[in-house]
């Protein structure tokens, strides 16, 4: 995900201007929004162009080498167009790698270093306080469209997956108090947000680090616990979509909330593989045979449930037989939304030492076969929706048509619903659409 801050409508000749680039995952986007909210509160304006700004901030991603390359390219572009650049984010946890290529940066900070970023901005271009510039909306600055927002409930992760370096970049799990999360969510909904996308490194582990401590919300105490938070969010009147949910046993508890319509019938659950031996090398939870049984039970409780997952092919030492286990599993699981990635060595990840690396051409072929198998599953599931009426949230609208998403589709990572409408629709509208045609990823229909 790449996001660039849009300028505000506020005018002020003395206000210093910031250009901002946000790279990486939705969690990083929330970090960017927090930094921008702080700076806007101090009177800084936002610039669409690097060459029109007093300083450029680049929030980097450092998870994969390809992400690092994208981050370094973004820094280079900012240096070429402006020259006064502050770097933050996950790649900032390895400053020597950045400084080696760009020694003249104003500052390099790691992830979650909000105060350090703001301090670096102050040093580069002090704020020009103005009572008219210092006003910001109560929901803060958002880099998403107005009708949806990411809601980060925790930081860090207690898992030690062998392919991942997130704990070394962002630390162990730190959960926000439930009351704080709910107050932020309420502000977003009051500001017009129709869809809350709950994110973290490990959403279903929420509150474990605090022993599920309670905090005040309205006239009662609410525990920092996965189910309790989901239930309370479901009372706010917006779509609530759960992301990055690990398959812990207590995930079963939220399925009835989905069946009751309290939260969306959607689970983003990164399973990564299906072969027991590969999962063991990954240090990933879950017995996939038992997981199939759980998925069946979930669908009995909530027939409309859509499960999204991601998988890695070409993990070190992955054999043909282990890959075939994965193919057999996805055919049987019939997941609604699936992504696939070729394993990419990450500096510092213990997976690099696990076994023989799978050749690039083999990884590419396995990904092709995986996505081909999943496309057949997806097409059957999508065609079953033809003739049905679905609720669709509109993302983009034109004179005679629009593009939106059903309850089974998250922004940017899932498919779309292409809508023909005889009446005007706007982004953020939730309309009923009769589905007339389907392909493997998108649906087509008419607003009714």
UniProtKB/Swiss-Prot annotation:
GO terms for biological process: tRNA modification. SUPFAM superfamilies: Radical SAM enzymes. Its main location: cytoplasm. Binds 2 [4Fe-4S] clusters. One cluster is coordinated with 3 cysteines and an exchangeable S-adenosyl-L-methionine. Residues 383-448 form the TRAM domain. It is an enzyme of class 2 (transferase). Its EC number is 2.8.4.4. GO terms for cellular component: cytosol. It catalyses: L-aspartate(89)-[ribosomal protein uS12]-hydrogen + (sulfur carrier)-SH + AH2 + 2 S-adenosyl-L-methionine = 3-methylsulfanyl-L-aspartate(89)-[ribosomal protein uS12]-hydrogen + (sulfur carrier)-H + 5'-deoxyadenosine + L-methionine + A + S-adenosyl-L-homocysteine + 2 H(+). Keywords: 4Fe-4S, Cytoplasm, Iron, Iron-sulfur, Metal-binding, S-adenosyl-L-methionine, Transferase. CDD domains: Radical_SAM (cd01335). Transmembrane segments: none annotated. PANTHER family: RIBOSOMAL PROTEIN S12 METHYLTHIOTRANSFERASE RIMO (PTHR43837), RIBOSOMAL PROTEIN US12 METHYLTHIOTRANSFERASE RIMO (PTHR43837:SF1). Belongs to the methylthiotransferase family. RimO subfamily. Catalyzes the methylthiolation of an aspartic acid residue of ribosomal protein uS12. This is Ribosomal protein uS12 methylthiotransferase RimO. The gene is rimO.
């Amino acid at each position: 995900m790449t996001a660039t801050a849009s300028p505000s409508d506020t005018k002020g000749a003395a206000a210093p201007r910031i250009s901002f680039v946000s790279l990486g995952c939705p969690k990083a986007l929330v970090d960017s929004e927090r930094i921008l909210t702080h700076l806007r509160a101090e009177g800084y304006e936002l610039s669409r162009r690097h060459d029109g700004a007093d300083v450029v901030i680049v929030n980097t991603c450092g998870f994969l080498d390809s992400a690092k390359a994208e981050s370094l390219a973004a820094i280079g572009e900012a240096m070429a167009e402006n020259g006064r650049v502050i770097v933050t984010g996950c790649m900032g946890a390895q400053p020597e790698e950045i400084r080696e290529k760009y020694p003249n940066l104003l500052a390099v900070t790691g992830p979650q270093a909000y105060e350090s970023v703001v301090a670096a901005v102050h040093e580069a271009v002090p704020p020009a306080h103005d009572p008219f510039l210092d006003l910001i909306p109560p929901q803060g600055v958002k880099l998403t469209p107005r009708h949806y927002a990411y809601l980060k409930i925790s930081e860090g992760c207690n898992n030690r997956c062998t392919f991942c370096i997130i704990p070394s970049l962002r630390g162990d799990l730190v959960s926000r108090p439930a009351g704080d999360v709910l107050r932020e969510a309420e502000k977003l909904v009051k500001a017009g947000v129709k869809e809350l996308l709950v994110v973290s490194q490990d959403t279903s582990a929420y509150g474990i680090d605090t022993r599920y401590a309670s905090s005040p919300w309205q006239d009662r105490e609410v525990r920092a616990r996965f189910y309790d938070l989901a239930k309370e969010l479901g009372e706010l009147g917006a779509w609530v979509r759960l992301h990055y949910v690990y398959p812990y046993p207590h995930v079963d508890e939220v399925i009835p909330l989905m069946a009751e319509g309290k939260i969306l019938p959607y689970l983003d659950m990164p399973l990564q593989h299906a072969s027991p031996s590969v999962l063991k090398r990954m240090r990933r939870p879950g017995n996939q045979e038992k997981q199939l049984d759980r998925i069946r039970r979930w669908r009995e409780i909530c027939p409309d449930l859509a499960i999204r997952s991601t998988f890695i092919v070409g993990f070190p030492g992955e054999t043909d037989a282990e890959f075939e286990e994965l193919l057999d599993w996805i055919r049987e699981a019939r997941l609604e939304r699936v992504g696939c990635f070729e394993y990419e060595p990450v500096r510092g990840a213990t997976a690099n030492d696990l076994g023989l690396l799978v050749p690039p051409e083999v990884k590419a072929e396995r990904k092709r076969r995986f996505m081909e198998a999943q496309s057949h599953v997806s097409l059957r599931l999508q065609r079953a929706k033809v003739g049905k009426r679905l609720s669709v949230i509109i993302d983009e609208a034109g004179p005679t048509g629009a593009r939106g998403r059903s309850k089974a589709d998250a922004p940017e990572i899932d498919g779309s619903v292409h809508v023909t409408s005889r009446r005007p629709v706007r982004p953020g509208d939730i309309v009923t659409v009769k589905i007339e045609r389907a392909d493997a990823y998108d649906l087509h229909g008419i607003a009714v």
